[in-house]
Amino acid sequence: MGFWENNKDSITSGLKSAGKYGYQGTKYVAKTGYKASKKHYNNSKARRERKSGKKNSSDEEYDSEDEMEYERKPTDIRSLKDPKSFPPPPLKPGQKTYTGQQQQQMPNGQASYAFQGAYQGQPGAGSTEQSQYAQPQYNQYPQQQLQQGVMPQQQQLQQGVVPQQPPIYGEQVPPYGSNSNATSYQSLPQQNQPQNAIPSQVSLNSASQQSTGFVSQNLQYGTQSSNPAPSPSFQNGLQCHQQPQYVSHGSTNLGQSQFPSGQQQQPTTQFGQQVLPSPAQPQQQQQGQPLPPPRGQVILPAPGEPLSNGFGQQQQQQQQQQQPLNQNNALLPQMNVEGVSGMAAVQPVYGQAMSSTTNMQDSNPSYGASPMQGQPPVGGQPPVPVRMQPQPPQPMQQGNIYPIEPSLDSTGSTPHFEVTPFDPDAPAPKPKIDIPTVDVSSLPPPPTHRDRGAVVHQEPAPSGKIQPNTTSSAASLPAKHSRTTTADNERNSGNKENDESTSKSSILGHYDVDVNIMPPPKPFRHGLDSVPSEHTTKNAPERAVPILPPRNNVEPPPPPSRGNFERTESVLSTNAANVQEDPISNFLPPPKPFRHTETKQNQNSKASPVEMKGEVLPGHPSEEDRNVEPSLVPQSKPQSQSQFRRAHMETQPIQNFQPPPKPFRRSQSSNSSDSSYTIDGPEANHGRGRGRIAKHHDGDEYNPKSENSTENGRLGDAPNSFIRKRAPTPPAPSRSEKLHEGTITSEVDSSKDANKYEKSIPPVTSSIQAQQSTKKAPPPVVKPKPRNFSLKANEYPKELTREATGQDEVLNSITNELSHIKLRKTNVNLEKLGGSKKVKDSSPVPSDLDEKYVSASGSITPPRPPPSRSSPKKVPPVVPKKNDNLKKKPPVVPKKKPLLKSLEPRPIEMERAYSGDISAADDNLNPFERYKRNVVPQEDDRLHKLK
């Protein structure tokens, strides 16, 4: 059975179902798309025909559907919810009232209007809004003035008249004890009419103002007396009279209706928006409820507010208002005329006639939030009419004033806004979780590592080496002792911990893990086992709190002589007692380089006269006692010496430094004692000009196995020779004497080297010597010296010992003795050298002679080449010619070029053969010249031959 036989039923059924549903879906999509496209086509066709004046009845259904779908009708404001039904908006943290809103309790305990007086604070309430609101408001003034006898604002500003006009709709506003809602808009049927007459902008503004909390009275801005606010001068007059005043709060608030009785305040007339709540509304607004400024509205200060607040806002806003007022001057005159006629009987003119003001105040409370609100009308003014009496405010939540859309009937451009009501029963947003601050001082110390205590208990840590346990948390920075430390130490560390942790209380939590980790081991140093152990055993138990290694600023005692071991030990013991741990700088000098001992064993016990000549001076016999060879120091304390020396290296003057060991030279032992006087060829050739004759034993002076006391005493003077070198030198001999001295010294060297080479057996060098010898370029091979030259019985002449007196005589005697011998590698005899200037140039005075003689005589020459092994009879070649014989002279290059030009072209084979002949000799030729010769084209040669 194949796969198809087993699964064909399921496959076919799946394909059928898939095809079925796929067909259905495709059909549905196709139908829907067709209908949509047809509908769209019909709609577009209807629009085109409508524009062209044609319209088919068959398209009406589509048109009607389109109108229902696409054309949005303005929402009736009356269908919206009462803004009082909304809870007050939430306040920001720490905010008690909204910006610019000020609430004032009326004398009778009723809440006064929370007038909105900070129009400046609203960024959107700019001059544009002011001008927009001002203009429709002025358009609204004529109607209001005709109906209500309202005096236009322009006239008020110019004349200082306070048009306090009651809403004249033939109705009397019930006293404040009555419900303001019932009295306000229901009792004012005419409000809607003037509102309708108001431009859309005014309606929008009024709607937004109604939403501020005056909606409860349905105060239509045009309908109710939109009293323009007086000018600042008028405000001043009002304040002087202590009568209800129009407080023009900038362009936004033309004035706030202030009741002479002080109990009621009419809604503020904002210049652009002029919110005119009915006299009954102020109480309804909210007791102590801040009125959020409506869109584009300014929050006027409460009437009971001090004059400073009212005037400050008024003047500021009036300054802002000047421009929109000036723009509306054209409308104002007409309104002024009508307003004056209407206000003549009703409203008094401040500053003009007190009777008129009294009448006006009687009819309508003065607009403007002045601190004089609570005062009764001035001078014989009749009490406020009953309709002007405050009505009992409806209970409202504080701050329950939302800028809700106006409820105007105008079907114009009133936008539709809906505010989602705030559910007071909804659970308040949960505050942020307050993480309790824990006193870190009460917390246990951070845990320590489990392995730290045991290790520290077994072996005390080095003094000053227990480093603070630095962890990621800053609270654990204080160093923790091991658990095995004393109780006092633990208490001290715990107190320090608590002190530091309290300052860093951000670290919370409890830590139970022990983190007393063993401090890391000290860096490995050779031979430090004994010294640190002594320090740690002495100082570790005394440490209360782990501290960093102390740095000793005290200058250590002067360094002892390198051989004075007892003094070194005493200084080290005192130093260890003072310092918990040796400073890092107290390193011992490095171990002495290994020196082969064969030459030491074969050397005589007596000091070399040549060496004594360079080092031993009369009057300094005690330097041997002061300088004992450091190799005699027991090797058990090498590191203590190194540490001590390193401690005093910085304080010791440079002049007192010991000379560094000389680089290892393969010494060749000799059976005779004259080997101690010789200088190796490498040293002679590669000397540094420091008087190597006097110090040629420095290479052997550091042999740790040498125990020859006389040798040690002799070698002890070597370091001091450097110090003495800086002292004033003895008087220099004459030139001739210096010259003889230099030549004699070189000849003595050559003779001793020859004897040593012949008589000595090359010592077996160790691997250390091989490594040290390979560090530098191998010195030239030392060739044997002439056999016929030797001093008497190979004894070094004692006359060579340099002394302060008789120095010239010794040199002269040596010169006479060696005058018959020719100098090595030169044809110059010593007899011919007397006073000749030639010696300065050709005399092979070794460059490694003492500077006292070589540099002063001016006969320094380049290093000598190694002596040849030829017989002594063979005259050595002149030194200047040796360099020319080292390599073959290349063929003269200039002669090749003219040959190339003069020769006729040859075949390439001949050219190659010719070039091959000279290839060995023309290594220095320009390779491009040879290249050019080889690449001469063969065709050119043929053509040339044909010619």
From Swiss-Prot:
It comes from the Eukaryota. Residues 36-54, 888-899 have a biased composition (Basic residues). Residues 70-84, 488-502, 749-759 have a biased composition (Basic and acidic residues). Residues 93-105, 130-163, 256-289, 313-334, 667-676 have a biased composition (Low complexity). It is a peripheral membrane protein. Residues 59-69 have a biased composition (Acidic residues). Residues 379-395, 862-879 have a biased composition (Pro residues). One of its GO terms (cellular component) is membrane raft. Residues 1-334, 354-810, 824-904 are annotated as: Disordered. Transmembrane segments: none annotated. Keywords: Membrane, Phosphoprotein. InterPro entries: Aim3. The modification Phosphothreonine is found at T729, T861. Residues 177-255, 354-367, 466-475, 633-644, 763-774 have a biased composition (Polar residues). It is found in: Membrane raft. Its main location: membrane. Disruption phenotype: Increases frequency of mitochondrial genome loss. GO terms for biological process: actin cortical patch assembly; barbed-end actin filament capping. The modification Phosphoserine is found at S57, S58, S64, S476. Interacts with RVS167. Belongs to the AIM3 family. This is Altered inheritance of mitochondria protein 3. It comes from Saccharomyces cerevisiae (strain ATCC 204508 / S288c). The lineage of its organism: Eukaryota, Fungi, Dikarya, Ascomycota, Saccharomycotina. The gene is AIM3.
